[in-house]
Amino acid sequence: MRVWIDADACPRAAKDQVIKFALKRKFEVLLVAGQSQVKPAFACVRLIVVPSGPDAADDYLVEHAEPGDLVICSDVPLADRLVKKGVAALDPRGRGFDERNMGERLAVRNLFTDLRDQGQVGGGQAAYGERDRQTFANALDRLLTRLSRSQ
């Protein structure tokens, strides 16, 4: 099993949590980014910097992640592409993406995009906090356990 991370948009605390699990459970972590980042100094972690361009990191993740892998991303359209391919996806706040909830998640995302474009709502998500980190860690633990049992 491999865990892929859409590294440009993922909070550092979530990346650190994945690496902590990787060291304990012995799986590979692949950080995919559109710009260079500092790679954590662990053998289980690889940094893949893709050429810059719209959706280049997303396209790389969809092309290379396989069923049985997990992708950490907050990009709902990316998660939809992954779920359709049979790849597990989880956002850094611990909310899973699957075929049952993708329609609703896409509709909500599109609604808020439209409202933002019209100036009716502003800003984005609240800052990533301790509660988010704990919720993510719990969801990650459950999902990794489920994925490891299915291999």
Curated annotation (Swiss-Prot):
Similarity annotation: Belongs to the UPF0178 family.
InterPro entries: UPF0178
Organism: Stutzerimonas stutzeri (strain A1501)
Protein name (database record): UPF0178 protein PST_0536
Top-rank lineage group of the source organism: Bacteria
Transmembrane segments: none
Family matches, as NCBIfam families: PRK00124.1 (NF001095)
Coiled coil: none
